[in-house]
Amino acid sequence: MIARLRGTLLEKRPPTLVVEANGLGYEVEAPLSTIEALPETGREVILHTHLSVREDGQTLFGFRTRAERDLFRRLIRVSGVGPKLGLALLSGVDGEELVRCVRDDDPKRLTQVPGIGRKTAERLIVELRDRLDGVGGGSTAAPAAGADHPTGENDPVSEAIEGLVALGYKPPEAARMARNAAEPELGCEAIIRRALQRAVPRGG
């Protein structure tokens, strides 16, 4: 089991990262909260990881804190929630808010995440309610300097569209969301975060 990865950040293409360690390039999938907190490419990063092994391949998931990884592991134990959906949940709702939704019995907030219907949201709340002791999501870490700015020459809007599609949105919807959220000087991660925040109105 790979529990921790330390190396040079080569690529940031939400939700995918490439980290080079000891001459090997590791492809890592990470929630938006983790990607936003990382430095620019070329810098050293440390990720707490979870390796998912299935018949069709292996996927390495990375998180900026142990608490966020632990929350992910609790999520994927819920019936009907696999690693991909768990990643989408932690990208659409940050860890602390997810914990709040469970403790406040608020399934409506969770149903705004692609792939989460009413029944799945209610099941999440029921099954997670007694599993969250000591878990807060670890979302208090501040984003790294420069995280809200483009990290390469690629169009941040196009990369944001790709990221939203990877999180479960249909391409036309992802394009609309990204373009509506885009502003000059915003990088890919910031556009995705803004698009997700607009898609999930608070207090609704």
Curated annotation (Swiss-Prot):
Residues 1-64 are annotated as: Domain I. The keyword DNA-binding applies. Homotetramer. Forms an RuvA(8)-RuvB(12)-Holliday junction (HJ) complex. HJ DNA is sandwiched between 2 RuvA tetramers; dsDNA enters through RuvA and exits via RuvB. An RuvB hexamer assembles on each DNA strand where it exits the tetramer. Each RuvB hexamer is contacted by two RuvA subunits (via domain III) on 2 adjacent RuvB subunits; this complex drives branch migration. In the full resolvosome a probable DNA-RuvA(4)-RuvB(12)-RuvC(2) complex forms which resolves the HJ. This is Holliday junction branch migration complex subunit RuvA. It is found in: Cytoplasm. The keyword DNA repair applies. The lineage of its organism: Bacteria, Pseudomonadati, Pseudomonadota, Gammaproteobacteria, Chromatiales. SUPFAM superfamilies: DNA helicase RuvA subunit, C-terminal domain, Nucleic acid-binding proteins, RuvA domain 2-like. It holds the Pfam family RuvA_N. Signal peptide: none annotated. Residues 153-204 are annotated as: Domain III. Belongs to the RuvA family. GO terms for molecular function: ATP binding; four-way junction DNA binding; four-way junction helicase activity. Transmembrane segments: none annotated. Its main location: cytoplasm. GO terms for biological process: DNA recombination; DNA repair. The RuvA-RuvB-RuvC complex processes Holliday junction (HJ) DNA during genetic recombination and DNA repair, while the RuvA-RuvB complex plays an important role in the rescue of blocked DNA replication forks via replication fork reversal (RFR). RuvA specifically binds to HJ cruciform DNA, conferring on it an open structure. The RuvB hexamer acts as an ATP-dependent pump, pulling dsDNA into and through the RuvAB complex. HJ branch migration allows RuvC to scan DNA until it finds its consensus sequence, where it cleaves and resolves the cruciform DNA. Keywords: Cytoplasm, DNA damage, DNA recombination, DNA repair, DNA-binding.
